[in-house]
Amino acid sequence: MRVDIVPVGDVPAHVKRQASSSLRSVYDCEVVVASEQDVPTAAYDEARSQYRAAEFIDTATRATSGDKTIAITPHDLFYRRRNYVFGLAYLDGRGCVVSTYRLQTSSDGGFSNRSSSDVFDDRVRKEVVHELGHTLGLEHCDNNRCAMNFSPTVREVDRKEENLCGSCQRTVF
């Protein structure tokens, strides 16, 4: 399986490296980092000062031909009535998106004795695994350590692991 990572907007190189490394490690897949795509201006909702997540998926999937496509963006995303989302994917679909905007440690109000860059990198790794998992047919998992566990806040993201639990692994592999 080939997974294309599509930066939408200015995504730092280390974020692309973390995402690539995590996807290769967990899913044993080929990963290609595609060229940066422009932010879809029509996706911006002025009243919310946020972007519609689904349009980032559309932008990324149009730009590549991989088996799966994951858009990564530094912009704040929302979906339907949710205040924000870390990412969005369509179950068994081809594309998904991860926003790093709310994965920054300055946004969480939490605490950790680890460096903020390490915490951020871990969050990125977990969320790309999570969103790609949805495109592979995985739904949210009840195991709070599994990468597929629903994580509405960064505290839940921090609690889970980068890897899939045994049950989710059996479903995918």
Curated annotation (Swiss-Prot):
Active site residues of this protein: E131 (proton acceptor)
Similarity-based family: Belongs to the peptidase M54 family.
Role summary: Probable zinc metalloprotease whose natural substrate is unknown.
Designated gene of the protein: amzA
HAMAP family: Archaemetzincin
Binding sites annotated in the UniProt record for Zn(2+) 1: H130, H134, H140
Binding site for Zn(2+) 2: C141, C146, C165, C168
Residue stretches in coiled coil: none
Subunit structure: Monomer.
Molecular function (Gene Ontology), one example: zinc ion binding
Cofactor: Zn(2+)
Organism ancestry: Archaea, Methanobacteriati, Methanobacteriota, Stenosarchaea group, Halobacteria
Identification of the protein by name: Archaemetzincin
